[in-house]
């Protein structure tokens, strides 16, 4: 299994070059590598570990298959659910077309491959992280990769580009997702005083925790410098959840006291957000700091969409109708990621995914609260989910590809370490 661990660590590091090459090629490479890692990890598992993996990861993966099934359904030629664009195209061509929900089957197929790659990485990371020493190795790889991504963000930011006399091309947008994932993970690992026990001395542990804390701070500064207010809000929420979990454990608070504190913080944050939202626009774009014309065009796009969406991965195609872009561009075509997801999957599926994400945050937080050693893994997973949940409402649609591997690794390690094997056997 250590060979598989080394492979997944290399794959995590490969998130950097993946974000710099052609998206179509990178999607295929990531899918192939993730499938290979999944096969290798399941083959290397011992019977007891396989049973434990099914227990901790099975329900989550079953829920995660629902979006994949929905994407497949969107690609099927179902004329009674077909997007109206197919009817208009048939009338133009003078021949009936057997349409589907999606308006771009190729784009939807690419999104399906990315989602399945994410699930493959989650399972592989969970299989590896059953052993705490291997989980620590994966976490350190994630921390190093996110630090490298943070450097790229700083060098790609508007002030630095202007100082260097170069135009901002925004090709580094995808690395923002990587950095957002890295901040809570590095912070949680820095606060976990008992989660690095693999023979290191006290001085070595202190040095490692210091490096992790410095990495978390550097990533947070880089993300806020690049993503401005939207990134700062998301990071603040993730950091707050990690710190709250740490404080609850340190002070030995009862679980209901922890839940009450979390609910109070959530209500305060919600009230603040509602007070500062854009009036008279859809909730998905009400909290973004974006130009008024972009917010309005996104609002118009959402108002005209069919209830079932227009297909996974089709935001750019849709936006061409509402935005006056000339040629290929990496600029955001909708105001928020939430708007992009609603445009692709439909409102009902989007809000279902939001609800499932909230349940996942609660489950990981409870696991971190009840865990002994290695509580930082489920705490990091909960904080990452919260960070990204808020980011979809405050940041524009960002390329998902660079963050797929890192996000899957964080969720996988959190699943494997949410419940100890000894406790599961005792229960």
Regions found by a protein language model. Name each.
Residues 39-57, 125, 271-296, 340:
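Cytoplasmic juxtamembrane interface segments
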Residues 282-290, 326-332, 374:
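Short, contiguous acidic/charged loop-to-helix segments that flank catalytic cores in large enzymes
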């Amino acid at each position: 299994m250590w060979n598989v661990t080394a492979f997944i660590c290399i794959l995590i590091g490969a998130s950097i070059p993946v974000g710099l090459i052609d998206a179509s090629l990178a999607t295929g490479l990531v899918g192939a590598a993730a499938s290979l890692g999944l096969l290798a990890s399941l083959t290397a598992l011992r019977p007891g570990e396989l049973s434990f993996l099914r227990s901790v990861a099975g329900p989550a993966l079953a829920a995660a298959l629902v979006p994949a099934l929905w994407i497949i359904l969107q690609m099927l030629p179902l004329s009674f659910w077909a997007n109206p664009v197919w009817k208009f195209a048939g009338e133009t061509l003078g021949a009936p077309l057997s349409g589907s929900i999606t308006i771009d089957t190729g784009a939807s197929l690419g999104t399906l491959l990315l989602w399945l790659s994410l699930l493959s990485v989650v399972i592989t990371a969970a299989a590896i992280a059953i052993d705490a020493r291997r989980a620590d190795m994966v976490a350190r790889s994630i921390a190093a990769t996110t630090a490298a991504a943070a450097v790229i963000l700083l060098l790609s930011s508007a002030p630095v580009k202007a100082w260097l006399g170069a135009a901002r091309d925004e090709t580094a947008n995808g690395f923002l997702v990587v950095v957002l994932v890295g901040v809570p993970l590095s912070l949680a690992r820095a606060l976990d005083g008992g989660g690095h026990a693999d023979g290191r001395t006290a001085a070595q542990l202190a040095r490692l925790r210091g490096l992790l804390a410095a990495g978390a701070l550097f990533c947070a500064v880089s993300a806020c410098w690049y993503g401005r207010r939207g990134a700062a809000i998301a990071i603040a929420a993730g950091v707050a959840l990690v710190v709250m979990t740490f404080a609850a454990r340190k002070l030995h608070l009862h679980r209901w006291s922890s839940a009450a504190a979390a609910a109070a913080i959530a209500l305060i944050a919600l009230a603040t957000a509602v007070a500062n939202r854009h009036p008279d626009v859809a909730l998905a774009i009400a909290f973004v700091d974006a130009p008024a014309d972009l917010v309005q065009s996104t609002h118009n796009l959402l108002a005209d969409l069919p209830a079932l969406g227009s297909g996974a991965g089709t935001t750019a195609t849709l936006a061409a109708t509402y935005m006056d872009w000339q040629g290929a561009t990496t600029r955001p075509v909708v105001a928020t990621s939430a708007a992009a997801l609603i445009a692709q999957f439909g409102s009902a599926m989007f809000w279902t995914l939001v609800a499932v994400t909230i349940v996942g945050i609660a489950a990981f937080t409870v696991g971190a609260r009840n865990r002994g050693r290695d509580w930082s893994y489920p705490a990091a997973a909960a904080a990452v989910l919260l960070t990204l949940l808020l980011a979809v409402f405050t940041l524009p649609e960002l390329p998902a590809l660079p963050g797929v591997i890192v996000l899957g690794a964080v969720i996988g390690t959190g699943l494997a370490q949410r419940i100890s094997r000894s406790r599961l056997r005792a229960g």
